[in-house]
Amino acid sequence: MKTTKERLAAAIQTPLKDSLAFYHTSLKGLDQEQVEENRDLYGENTITKGQEDSIFKKIYESIINPFTIILLVIAFISLVTNVWLAKPGQEDPTTSIIIVVLVLISGGIRFVQELRSDKATTNLSKMIVNTATVIRDGLEQELPIDELVVGDLVKLSAGDMIPADVILFESRDFFVQQSGLTGESDAVEKLALNKATSQNIESLLEAESLAFMGTNVISGSATAMVLAVGDDTMMGAIEQTLNTYDEPTSFEREMNSISWLLIRLMLVMVPIVFFANGLTDGDWLEAGVFALSVGVGLTPEMLPMIITASLAKGSIIMAKEKVVIKKLNAIQDLGAIDILCTDKTGTLTQDEIVLEYPLDIHGDLDMAVLRRAYLNSHFQTGLKNLMDRAIISRTEKESKEHAILQDLDKIFQKIDELPFDFERRRMSVIVKDDSNVVSMVTKGALEEMLTISTHVEYRGEIIPLTEDIRQEVLAEVGQLNRQGLRVLGVGYKSGLREDYAYAVTDESDMILTGYLAFLDPPKPSAAPAIQALLEHGVKTKILTGDNEKVTQAICEKVGLDVEHMLLGADIDQMTDQELAEAVESVTVFAKLSPDQKARIILQLKKNGHGVGYMGDGINDAPSMKVADVGISVDTAVDIAKETADVILLDKDLMVLETGIVEGRKVYANMTKYIKMTVSSNFGNIFSLLVASIFLPFLPMAPVHLIVLNLVYDLSCVALPFDNVDQDFLKQPHTWEAKSITRFMVWMGPISSVFDILTFIFLYFIIVPLVTGHHYVHGSESALQFIILFQTGWFIESMWSQTMVIHMLRTAKVPFVQSRPAWLVILMTLVAAFFVTSLPYGPLVNILRLAPLGLPYFLFLICIIFLYMFSVTVIKKFYIKKYKEWL
């Protein structure tokens, strides 16, 4: 069978009827039997995004990471020293076995969590389906893109994403944006096979009659036959041969920064602990194992799992709120925005545009204006927007009473069209009536219509467009705009040639016949939603292509500041510095092109803001791409949905507010884990360093450190489900390694102070009370003394680490002003009591622990309560100094 490139190259040189026959199809499309045969022969229309990981690879990646490698190295060293090099009868593989079991438990939890996350993401993705209009068995039908097969006939129009590599056999002013494949930013016109001027090209991408998967239809329409699907397409080939690089998000950058912070800290502390213990005790091998254990203790091994669980939980909650998170990280990015940019249509307004008035130039109702507007909207092949639909709907309604509006699609025949673009802000159709009179009918923004008109029509009389008439029209339209009505102008000219290739330059010397006034009222929820966003630290800015008067009227009704409004023309005259200042004070921007919208968003980002952009049209895709979070709706055009990070199933700002709050909850609970764990572990390591210098033995066995670390991490598994203070949700937050370092340096030494107090009490009071004597190096009772000491600090460390979670998880007074989730309470208590029970259970000899008496537990209660009180006091000083907590 020929390769895909050979088939594409052959298709542009082959008559259409021969290509149809080759793929066993016809102008009626494939039948179901042939669909299955072509699918078996040419494959499915899905691109392999790299080979899916096997279950074994997922298990491997869940278990093996830099931290577990260190653990396994410790296990290996312990195996060598305690088994292979041990004297006969003294072999003890306990430490190695415990470490391996702990690694497997940690990896198993992460593996299960990753599987749940993957499943949730897959289920959410299935909620958003891009479709294509396909002709099969002579009928047009909407099918998911992945159901297309080679030989299918597809209908394409403005706003569509090309669903496969296709060859055009019908086209009408069909322009495609294929910068993703070629790098060229300008739209390219594609022609039907029989109209292509030259097929002698160096690259298939230059072929005028070929369009490729993943490119976007900017304007016009076409009918095409699918030539290649899935991995066989140009896009599929690129996916298979290139490792695409996505620029890391701010979240990913800060996670990397935190990781390097921990690595640097570990590189400093581990050698110090190693030399301190080696010089004190003289056992360098044991000192090495202990130092490596310290390194493990300093790192939050469960961080990847906590992050995944938090993001997945947020995504699942948002799905219940009719918000689909396409990328897990987007939920956190959504919580970090402090500016939401959005078009007003369908967001502030009800998205149900009604044509209120078809008016002549003096503002009187005129069905002749509606007649011409209908011709323009009905016969255009581009994307019919809400106003086109409103025109068609009003015409169908009025045609029952007005003969002038009846049978227009039979009276008129379309000759040509000039599609809409965002520079001209208008579109034209050329039609011929049953008297063979050829006319151009143009509809567009009134200001643009006035620039191309030389005459006006009033009650059948055509007169020159004078300055007085122009001002009268503008005054009338201004009045309508102030009422919140959107206005389009309608013009025409007749007596044109049929056999002529019309161009944009022919939109001249037009006769302005009237205008159309549309009503798109604000949503009742718009004003409270904007206020709710503001209360959560998110300012709403309107970026619209509509004119300033309509925009002003709508924005005033929903409570937005319209005193300072910027227009697209103003922005073009501004330097970057001037725009940087303007975007801070201006709330409403009108008459913008897509490029101007993107420029505003980029400037806001340069100013240090987290920016979300919400849109649903072709012109919104560039803005969504440059924003920190691109937001769209399930009814948006394909390219908008493809570009978006977040898709709303309900186009309502109230839903977004919920998403932003949920994103901040995700951030809060991840931050809790990182700050708590890093500061707690730092305190433990500082305590170990002090103990290593002053104690004649290890304050805790390596296996104790590892068990302590894992049990603590398991208790933190509940943190993604913790409650978050309402005050914290009022403002956006960003990741800062500096903030984490500061928190660690402040809170870590506090735990060290109480650890050192514990050392003193254990060494001089509690352990001597139990053993009846003080520590004497080399004596028969020395081992018992060491085991009791290590047990005492082991239990105290667990209680201090788990109980302080409740102090650190909130800036408020815990349990009184801020209550943790019941699962957090349960997990911390289970962890603390589990470790406390170990000296009294079956693992006592394996872990080398020993029971402690009542004096120890009285001391433990006092030291833990004193520690919690001290943390609460220091917390108030910290918040007062730095104006933050988490």
Model feature map: region roles:
Residues 527-529, 535, 547-558, 595-603, ...:
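Acidic, divalent-metal-coordinating active-site segment for phosphoryl/phosphodiester hydrolysis
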Residues 64-84, 100-110, 129-130, 260-278, ...:
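Alpha-helical transmembrane segments of multi-pass membrane proteins
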Residues 1-140, 146-149, 154-162, 167-247, ...:
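Non-lumenal N-terminal regulatory segments of integral membrane proteins
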Residues 210-218, 333-511, 518, 531, ...:
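Cytosolic catalytic regions of ATP/NTP-dependent phosphoryl-transfer enzymes
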Residues 73-98, 261-299, 312-322, 498-501, ...:
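Helix-interface capping motifs at the ends of transmembrane segments in multi-pass membrane proteins
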Residues 44-76, 118, 140, 201-210, ...:
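Soluble-to-membrane junctions at the N-terminal ends of transmembrane alpha-helices
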